[in-house]
Amino acid sequence: MKKHIGISLFFMGCFLSLSATNYFVATNGDDSNAGTLDKPFATLQKAQSKVVPGDTVYIRGGEYRIREEQMMGGDHLRAYVFEMNKSGTQAKRICYTGYQDERPIFNLAEVKPEGKRVSVFYVSGSYLHFRNFEIIKTQVTIREHTQSECIYNQGGNHNIYENLAMHDGMAIGFYLVRGSNNLVLNCDAYNNYDPVSENGTGGNVDGFGGHPASASYTGNVFKGCRAWYNSDDGFDLIKAQAAYTIEDCWAFYNGYKPGGFVGAGDGTGFKAGGYGMRSKVKMPNEIPHHVVKNCLAYKNKNKGFYANHHLGGI
């Protein structure tokens, strides 16, 4: 059922290289090891501490049950599980990928920092490539209005997120506020519902959120992605200050609690913009014109395609 969109990524892909270092992480590894195929690290945190531009981290298959003491950073609002703050270069990306046809899964069920939003992959680095793994059971602990994110691109540019699945948790699948020229390719977000905050309304759990906070954050793309059974919207561009492109994507069964048709949040398939209806909302100097093309919406709770009063239309 997966719809793969072809794109020429060979020159920026992850592959075994003779001119850079390849590190390995495995469920039976040890962070005192050398990080080789035969003696892998145990954690992605250890591998990330070693990489330089051009390196690749291969993550062996299996389930990685993440613990709170493994968190790499945070601020007054968020806890960062994996703080991806190292950058590659245009010629030498840093890659984090499932090994060959193996499918690693990061399980966040035990990460419940009190009073904090959870950002599983907090990405401020640039020229990174994340590929072929899953993030499950991301938690929410705050009772008031809040959110958690499986992937939060906060300042990273020229990143690729490919063939990832963010599912069966309480968090937004992918969320961008700062950064330019980021490609989210062939990724899935599904079965995500927050029963904890705001009495379980589920109104802040989108599949994919593109919300660039500056007109300079251009060139961001969702391509070949699917969103279903997210308790709010499938794809949401509300308050975006720069144009976003959504291409060849699917949105279905959003706005419901997973597994049935019990209503939860807004339930729009593709919510392409808008700045709210309050009289004091600050508009950007130039309203961005989002592009949504070759996309499919089916049986979302509210609308399939909705400009959300966006002055630039779609």
Predicted regions: what they are:
Residues 18-46, 63-65, 100:
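Right-handed parallel beta-helix/beta-solenoid
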Residues 1-21:
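Bacterial Sec-dependent N-terminal signal peptides
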